[in-house]
UniProtKB/Swiss-Prot annotation:
Residues reported in the UniProt entry to bind FAD: 12-45
Enzyme's top EC category: oxidoreductase
A GO term, aspect molecular function: oxidoreductase activity, acting on the CH-CH group of donors
Gene Ontology biological process: carotenoid biosynthetic process
InterPro entries: Amino_oxidase (IPR002937), Carotenoid/retinoid_OxRdtase (IPR014105), FAD/NAD-bd_sf (IPR036188), Phytoene_DH_bac_CS (IPR008150)
Protein name, UniProt field: Phytoene desaturase (lycopene-forming)
UniProt keywords, alphabetically: Carotenoid biosynthesis, FAD, Flavoprotein, Oxidoreductase
Upper lineage: Bacteria, Pseudomonadati, Pseudomonadota, Alphaproteobacteria, Rhodobacterales
Length: 501
């Protein structure tokens, strides 16, 4: 066997979130003996899962788009994702609700969508169609052409720049939407998506309008049994391919020898060696903590600290004795303010008095997520990260949860608090302590234009040449399609490096 063939090589991937799992599958599929090391007792990263009183709670991502990107992981070795995962369509994609009673069902059926747009403002129909065409353009340019390109060289960014400038990528999503649509509610409806990947609609590049086209093309889906079942399916595929996963295996450091990574040392003292090391962990954690013993780690951590980080989330999981009627799978409950609230979420310096909420009600699509007749939910509020607002979440968390439950009861689910079976909160402090998230950020580095593509942490380190990044902190960014795309980009680099070694 050729000493430089992929089959002769080994890799360690740190972190069994979606990005780490997707990368490990790609490497193992290419014949690289891959070990996936996960600090927690279950795989999934942010997509953790737990059971409580018969309720099945997904901890993290709940919106599955671009199913073809997931199916590709199975197709690499001639397998079918349906063997391990059942995807269920979600309709409407989202239900948007405002104080005062306005409701907009974000659906994929063009006639239904346009009929609702006309009810808000008939004059915006033509503008919406032009926005739809624009979203398709940026989808082709930003997602299809560039979404899995590893931007390792400035020349790659310069090559992409003319098309991005033509598409006015320097404008924010909201500003671009506003050039097509005049109604303020509809402007919110077609710009809020960036919040789902950690971006401020008023500063995130208009390239992210591609999400509208991505959802129209591929739909919005839910994994039967919960997002955790997508994780379980990916683990099953990885292990069938011969990959090894270690749980309760916290990495204490990435070992190096000069400009090369040689493996990892676990917190229990075990040392693992490999030809290549990749990390799906928080990008600051990688450099500050795991590589903090190196000059590269120290210098990179300093530069990362100067970057803008995405907001955090306050997450409240709860079960109900009853299944509420007429509640959509995904509901966005806007507050009385939009731009002002979003700016306070991203800039601090304190927790706002009002909030906008995202409610996940999976039993609408899959009743088996709760005991018969009951329902499982989680609600989240975007909040400032720990570097923007000095909030004692041990004190504020329970109070904030009470305010959120009261709001849900008033606006959407009557008698909610009387029907509670269980609750659990996850705060920015938990993001920091349990997920090593810098500042408790829920989505890593904020996806503004000057922190995207080549400007984002690269998929391969420039100094430690066999150390690679995958996940939300590298190109293209957060969200399931983003981190799965980052795995494809990173795998390309790793396999290319092996081939040229």
């Amino acid at each position: 066997m050729n000493a430089h063939s992929p089959a002769a090589k080994t890799a360690i991937v740190i972190g069994a979130g979606f990005g780490g799992l997707a990368l490990a599958i790609r490497l193992q599929s290419a014949g690289i003996a891959t070990t996936l090391v996960e600090a927690r007792d279950k795989p999934g990263g942010r997509a953790y899962v737990w059971h409580d009183q018969g309720h099945l709670f997904d901890a993290g991502p709940t919106v599955i788009t671009d199913p073809d990107a997931l199916k590709e992981l199975w197709a690499l070795t001639g397998q079918d994702m349906a063997r391990d995962v059942t995807l269920m369509p979600v309709s409407p994609f989202y239900r948007l609700m405002w104080p005062g009673g306005k409701v907009f069902d974000y659906v994929n059926e063009a006639d239904q969508l346009e009929r609702q747009i006309a009810q808000f403002n008939p004059d915006d129909l033509e503008g919406y169609r032009r926005f739809r065409d624009y979203a398709e353009e940026v989808y082709q340019e930003g997602y299809v052409k560039l979404g899995t390109v590893p931007f390792l060289k400035l020349g790659q960014m310069l090559k992409a720049a003319p098309a991005l400038m033509k598409l006015e990528a320097y404008k924010s999503v909201h500003a671009k939407v506003a050039t097509f649509i005049k109604d303020p509610y509809l402007r919110q409806a077609f710009s809020y998506h960036t919040l789902l990947v950690g971006g401020n609609p008023f500063s995130t590049s208009s390239i992210y309008a591609l999400i509208h086209a991505l959802e129209r093309r591929g739909g919005v889906w839910f994994a039967k049994g919960g997002t955790n079942q997508l994780v379980a399916g990916m683990v099953a595929l990885f292990e069938r391919l011969g990959g090894q996963m270690l749980l309760n295996a916290k990495v204490a450091r990435i070992d190096t020898d000069g400009p090369r990574a040689t493996g990892v040392t676990l917190a229990d003292g075990r040392a693992l060696t490999a030809d290549m090391v990749a990390s799906n962990g928080d990008v600051m954690h990688n450099y500050r903590d795991l590589l903090g013993h190196t000059a590269r780690g120290q210098s990179r951590a300093k530069s990362l600290n100067a970057k803008r980080w995405s907001m955090s989330l306050f997450v409240l999981h709860f079960g109900l004795r009853e299944a509420p009627k007429d509640v959509a799978h995904h509901t966005i409950l806007f507050g009385p303010r939009y731009k002002e609230l979003v700016n306070e979420i991203f800039k601090g310096p304190k927790l706002a008095e009002d909030f906008s909420l995202y409610l996940h009600s999976p039993c609408t699509t899959d009743p088996e997520m709760a005991p018969p007749g009951m329902s499982t939910h989680y609600v989240l509020a975007p909040v400032p990260h720990l570097g923007r607002a000095d909030i004692d979440w041990a004190v504020e968390g329970p109070r904030y949860a009470d305010r959120i439950l009261a709001s849900l009861e008033e606006r959407l689910i009557p008698n909610l608090r009387a029907n509670l079976t269980t609750t659990r909160i996850f705060t920015p402090s938990d993001f920091a302590s349990e997920l090593n998230a810098h500042h408790g950020s829920a989505f890593s580095v904020e996806p503004i234009l000057t922190q995207s593509a080549w400007f984002r942490p690269h998929n391969r380190d420039k100094t430690i040449r066999n150390f690679y990044l995958v996940g939300a902190g590298t190109h293209p960014g957060a969200g399931i399609p983003g981190v799965v795309g980052s795995a494809k980009a990173t795998a390309q680099v790793m396999l290319s490096d092996l081939a040229s070694a």
